[in-house]
A protein has these predicted regions:
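Alpha-helix-loop-beta-strand connector modules within alpha/beta enzyme cores
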Residues: 106-122, 169-185, 337
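His/Asp/Glu-enriched, well-ordered alpha-helical/loop segment
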Residues: 203-208, 212-231, 304-306, 312-390
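Active-site loop-to-helix "anion-binding N-cap" substructures in soluble metabolic enzymes
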Residues: 69, 95-121, 126-135, 140, ...
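C-terminal cap of metal-dependent C-N hydrolases
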Residues: 11, 320, 324, 378-440
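Metal-associated gating/positioning segment near the N- to mid-region
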Residues: 53-119
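Histidine-rich, glycine-flanked metal-binding segment
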Residues: 1-57
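Divalent metal-coordination and catalytic microenvironments
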Residues: 11, 24, 29, 52, ...
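Histidine/acidic residue-rich metal-binding segments in metalloenzymes
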Residues: 136-151, 157-306
Length: 441
């Protein structure tokens, strides 16, 4: 067939749960054909990847804190989406907090969309927020196109986004049940968390946020979801003790899924140097035995996807001057590095790029109902990544595209380099041409 705007040919294409030689035909920004290598497709432009490169679907990162408007010294739409594109991420979904105003009603969503317009290099969707007092606005947020709503079950760290108590959580879920909405939750129980001792020793901070903080909060979420029938999702699982609770809930018919993040799959508490607050996040990075259990949970499907939880701040807020884990902001910036970070660890564990595409593209897109994202298949957006899985590089934070050069991966040698990124059939370049998405796009 003729008439394709773009044909991308590769000896290794990740599509349909397999890796095979193929040609991908694109017209009007949409994949129209995926055919075996020996079949010719004629296009206005034809790109043949070198043998060392693999064609992946563009990744979908559903856990990104862009922080604009209001805290653009931390991050912003231009820098975050440029970092995403450089890392093979073609769709991000922005979290409702750390921006001012937080995205807790349709008016705030419109403010955020206006802030993003014209400066995004990849496609961007939005989460709404559930906070005390906005239950009556959740259906309007849903109608305005958010992919779901997020709540905290303990203090979020910013005063404009307070947590829900158990009664407020049930009220929010009851409201969402009328539109079959999705609620995602930061699951830590404040009653199980002690004050972090001041100082440079990571072990003190880790001990202040034990696994029980996660398990208690997840148990409460499961109970509320079971009562209301609403679909819920646990963000950034760090404690392996959560996994049996998730398995039991799914067996009982609760509509629950969960994610983990690159740092929980690749870092270990025993390796965190004294005062290295770039490793601080909440919930915390735990030990290597726990890390192995998270990989097992990912392999058996208990954890459905891997997303970055890109949560940047200024270097000053990381308190590098003192290295005080108690005082430093908790958050890890890894949007540009998620793919090579996870791939480096995954290949060492015998996993394949089929797994990467499932965990980091297909399932995140399915989670948030972005039906045209996450797969190389006819009818999907032509969001494509040329990835050299065997090429290595050393992380230089100053070479990354996000705003502040802070990374726990500084100096690490990682495997896998993004050679090229296409958004809806066009190479991502110097001009921002991303779209602002609504649920269902």
């Amino acid at each position: 067939m003729t008439g394709y705007d773009l044909v991308v040919a590769a000896r290794r294409v990740v599509a349909g749960g397999a890796i095979a030689p193929a040609r991908v035909g694109v017209r009007d920004g949409v994949i129209r054909a995926v055919v075996p290598w020996e079949h010719e497709l004629l296009g206005t432009e034809t790109v043949t990847l070198p043998d060392e490169a693999v064609l992946l679907p563009g990744l979908v990162d559903t856990h990104v804190h862009v922080n604009e408007p209001g805290r653009t010294e931390w991050e912003g739409f231009a820098t975050a989406t440029a970092a995403a594109a450089a890392g093979g991420v073609t769709t991000v979904v922005d979290m409702p907090l750390n921006s001012v105003p937080p995205t807790v009603d349709p008016a705030a969503l419109e403010v955020k969309r206006e802030a993003a317009a014209g400066q995004v290099y990849v496609d961007v969707g939005f989460w709404g927020g559930a906070v005390p007092g906005n239950t009556g606005r959740l259906r309007a947020l849903h109608a305005a196109g958010v992919v779901g709503v997020k709540c905290f079950l303990l203090d979020s760290g910013v005063p404009e986004f307070p947590p829900l108590d158990p009664a407020q959580l049930r009220a929010a879920l009851t409201e969402l049940s009328t539109v079959d909405g999705l609620l995602i939750a930061h699951c830590e129980d404040a009653a199980a968390i002690g004050p972090a001792p001041p100082g440079r020793d990571y072990r003190g901070f880790l001990a202040s946020r034990p696994p029980q903080a996660e398990t208690r909060a997840v148990a409460g979420l499961i109970a509320a979801a079971s009562e209301t029938g609403v679909r819920v999702h646990v963000v950034h699982v760090s404690a392996a003790e959560v996994l049996p609770l998730l398995r039991a809930a799914v067996a009982d018919g609760v509509r629950i899924t969960a994610e983990t993040c690159p740092h929980y799959l690749t870092l270990a508490a025993e390796d965190v140097p004294a005062g290295a607050t770039q490793f601080k996040c909440c919930p915390p990075v735990r030990d290597a035995v726990n890390r192995d259990a998270l990989w097992a949970g990912l392999a058996d499907g208990t954890l459905s996807c891997v997303v970055s939880d890109h949560s940047p701040c200024t270097p000053e807020l990381k308190r590098f001057d003192t290295g005080d884990f108690a005082a430093a902001w908790g958050g890890i910036s890894s949007l540009q590095l998620s793919l090579p970070v996870v791939w480096t660890a995954a290949v060492a564990r015998g996993r394949s790029l089929v797994d990467i595409a499932l965990w980091m593209a297909q399932r995140p897109a399915e989670l948030v109902g972005l039906r045209s994202k996450g797969s190389i298949a006819p009818g999907f957006d032509a969001d494509l990544v040329a990835f050299a899985p065997d090429q290595e590089f050393t992380v230089d934070p100053h070479a990354l595209r996000h705003r502040n050069p802070v990374s726990p991966y500084a100096g690490r040698t990682l495997r896998g380099v993004v050679r090229d990124t296409w958004l809806r059939g066009e190479r991502v370049g110097d001009a921002p041409r991303g779209r602002l998405l609504r649920r269902g796009d």
